[in-house]
Amino acid sequence: MNTQQLAKLRSIVPEMRRVRHIHFVGIGGAGMGGIAEVLANEGYQISGSDLAPNPVTQQLTSLGATIFFNHRPENVRDASVVVVSSAISADNPEIVAAHEARIPVIRRAEMLAELMRFRHGIAIAGTHGKTTTTAMVSSIYAEAGLDPTFVNGGLVKAAGVHARLGHSRYLIAEADESDASFLHLQPMVAIVTNIEADHMDTYHGDFENLKQTFINFLHNLPFYGRAVMCVDDPVIRELLPRVGRQTTTYGFSEDADVRVEDYQQIGSQGHFTLLRQGMPDLHVTLNAPGRHNALNAAAAVAVATEEGIDDDAILRALESFQGTGRRFDFLGEFPLEPVNGKAGTAMLVDDYGHHPTEVDATIKAARAGWPDKKLVMLFQPHRYTRTRDLYDDFANVLTQVDALLMLDVYPAGEAPIPGADSRSLCRTIRNRGKIDPILVSDPAQVATMLAPVLTGNDLILVQGAGNVGKIARYLSEIKLKPQIQEEEQHG
């Protein structure tokens, strides 16, 4: 950003006084790195620490950030403020050193709230669909020439980044309910896609507590703000009378203010009509598969319509939508060795979904777009607590595929829980008699164990939120062909 552009931005968004150097602990996370990228482009000195390099840290380094691949007290020297992710413990040496030096230590959402404070904030919350909906809203606003700032939890593929600094007053951000930190945000517009039981440790196992927290989040809207909510979700429908703000509903339901009708999927595209009260119908071609993505698009259209964005810009953005990283991410179609003398191919798709509802939506999208293909899933459960709490739901959903390979649970720092492991889940699924899951204890053997399952007309879904995405990229690099020596580092 040049001096003239920065001066224009400062006329809209004042700088944070006395803050020059911002240090991020856990800077390699998508949410942390996105905020760091916006602040780097605003001209602040950025440093941060994490355990290993990744694409996020590489991008930040290219912007001039100083990245340490360790956690040491001296890393916070001269910092004006230290930003921490929810994954960082209070005894981290950098946090301890910051407290001793009387440097303010704040959570990621507090910094995001500061970015939003002087902007027209649009926050996207909900158990599922936040990242894709954030990208859709950002794409529509960009297509309309509104040059928004956005901060997303996943890679916005059209932009090639998780976050971007725009020169307008608009800030579009994913709002994270996993640690209730979205309560720091005070947006002008809030989308809530759905509300389900997840991250229940944060809410002390009390679903009513979770629901009330979403209401509290919506009460952060000014009285002239707007809540955009999916009326198909039974919990949202129940909570609507308690919102106390202007509300637009969307969904397939007949009473939705923005209603999805006549949905059909052809390959990776969805085709449907959006009915809007007092506005012309929109005949949408969406470059993303699945009914769940039609709902995400309806939310984005509801916000754009409220802002007065031209319908042609909305339709162009949705038809050209490039998606987000690891959300039904098509990695390629690869030729296979002939099976019974007949050559064939397998499609490879990488998807971040790790909750039963998300996995179910991905399976349905795959079935709708490619009904004749054998659906093979490589699944990695994420967290022992989630596997325990949603065990039966996982067992029900995972039996819908034609073949299942399952990796060990990605612990995300949790200790193992007896009976909430992959071996137990495989046994439960096997006992139901529909499919015979294969437990993959060694990630380095995935390609070898996958090969006999494939028929030459396959769609492989690599599913989960842990390091299974690295395996997906490795399978793409080797074109699904088992290597003589498969290195465990690719797991």
From Swiss-Prot:
Q: Which SUPFAM superfamilies does UniProt cross-reference here?
A: MurCD N-terminal domain, MurD-like peptide ligases, catalytic domain, MurD-like peptide ligases, peptide-binding domain
The keyword Cell wall biogenesis/degradation belongs to this UniProt entry's keyword annotation: yes
The cross-references to InterPro entries, in alphabetical order and at most eight, read: Mur-like_cat_sf (IPR036565), Mur_ligase_C (IPR004101), Mur_ligase_C_dom_sf (IPR036615), Mur_ligase_cen (IPR013221), Mur_ligase_N (IPR000713), MurCDEF_pg_biosynth (IPR050061), UDP-N-AcMur_Ala_ligase_MurC (IPR005758)
Q: Name a GO molecular-function annotation.
A: ATP binding
Involved pathway(s):
Cell wall biogenesis; peptidoglycan biosynthesis
* Annotated positions binding ATP: G126, T127, H128, G129, K130, T131, T132
Q: Name one GO biological process term.
A: cell division
Protein origin, superkingdom: Bacteria
The compartments listed are:
Cytoplasm
Q: Which GO terms describe its cellular component?
A: cytoplasm
Among PANTHER family, the record links this protein to: UDP-N-ACETYLMURAMATE--L-ALANINE LIGASE (PTHR43445:SF3), UDP-N-ACETYLMURAMATE--L-ALANINE LIGASE-RELATED (PTHR43445)
The family annotation for this protein states: Belongs to the MurCDEF family.
Task: Tell me the protein's name.
Answer: UDP-N-acetylmuramate--L-alanine ligase
Whose protein is this, by species?
Answer: Salmonella choleraesuis (strain SC-B67)
Q: What taxonomic classification does the UniProt entry list for its organism?
A: Bacteria, Pseudomonadati, Pseudomonadota, Gammaproteobacteria, Enterobacterales
